[in-house]
Regions:
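Amphipathic, hydrophobic secondary-structure cores in small proteins
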Residues: 40-52
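Non-catalytic, surface beta->alpha helical segment in thiol-disulfide oxidoreductase systems
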Residues: 60-85
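A broad structural signal for alpha-helix termini and local helix breaks/kinks
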Residues: 35-36, 83
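Short strand-loop junctions, especially beta-strand C-caps/beta-turns
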Residues: 13-17, 58, 63-65
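Generic domain-boundary/flexible-linker signal
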Residues: 21-23, 52, 64
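Local sequence-structure signature of Cys/Sec-based thiol-disulfide redox active-site neighborhoods
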Residues: 2-35
Length: 85
């Protein structure tokens, strides 16, 4: 592993009352394929229709910002971009 690359805490915030959990788990499954780039992964159930993915506290994907659920590939691309600089 290249130690110059950043390791990330990934936080997936999802609306538990809106049944967003299946999408959160699908994103989690894909994110875990990059486990050597991760320092921590957090699933955070919230309310209010929220579905967000944050990398080290910075919003990288959002259902409300993107007018729909971010795809797993979109999330992985955002993580790769954040990692590389």
């Amino acid at each position: 592993m290249n130690m110059d690359l950043k390791r990330f805490q990934i936080r997936i915030r999802y609306c538990a009352t809106c049944n967003h959990e299946p999408h959160a788990l699908a994103v989690l499954e894909r994110v875990l394929k990059y486990k050597m780039a991760l320092s921590e992964v957090i699933l955070e159930p919230v309310e209010g229709g929220v579905f967000e993915v944050l990398a080290n506290g910075k919003l990288i994907a959002s259902r409300t910002e993107e007018s729909g659920f971010p795809g797993t590939e979109e999330v992985l691309t955002a993580i790769r971009k954040a990692r590389s600089g």
